[in-house]
């Protein structure tokens, strides 16, 4: 699996995902599915990680927590393979938030710490601040 030069249609879909996240779950999932199908065809880890991460995030905002772990779990390998460290750290933060909501505090701490490890290693100050804020609440 590789990172490929992304065609304009995929770049447009990715931009739509970034711009409309949190506003229209059905459209977000459709955009992500289109990206995922294309990425599967061409073997693009970067796009697969992106699509699964944003699907997971959309499911979180829709309160479908079981699907969050399914999508984020799928995303993590692709995100790491393609070096999308900010999304890796954000994935761990999201899994921690869901774990807190389910009362699994020990898992939440592990996820927060994993996210912080990536933040420190790759100097991801914004994500690090979000994780630290979540840890403090």
Question: Which residue ranges define each predicted feature?
Answer:
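Tetratricopeptide repeat
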Residues: 28, 34-35, 68, 74-75, ...
């Amino acid at each position: 699996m590789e990172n490929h030069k992304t065609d304009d249609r995929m770049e447009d879909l990715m931009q739509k995902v970034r711009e409309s996240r949190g506003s229209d779950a059905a459209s977000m999932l459709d955009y992500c599915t289109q990206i995922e199908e294309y990425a599967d065809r061409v073997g693009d880890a970067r796009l697969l990680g992106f699509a699964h991460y944003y699907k997971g995030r959309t499911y979180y905002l829709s309160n479908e927590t079981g699907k969050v772990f399914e999508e984020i779990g799928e995303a993590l390998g692709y995100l790491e393979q393609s070096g999308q460290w900010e999304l890796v750290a954000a994935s761990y933060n999201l899994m921690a938030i869901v774990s807190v909501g389910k009362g699994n505090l020990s898992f939440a701490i592990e996820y927060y710490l994993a996210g912080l490890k990536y933040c420190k290693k790759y100097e991801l100050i914004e994500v690090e601040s979000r994780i630290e804020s979540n840890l403090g609440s």
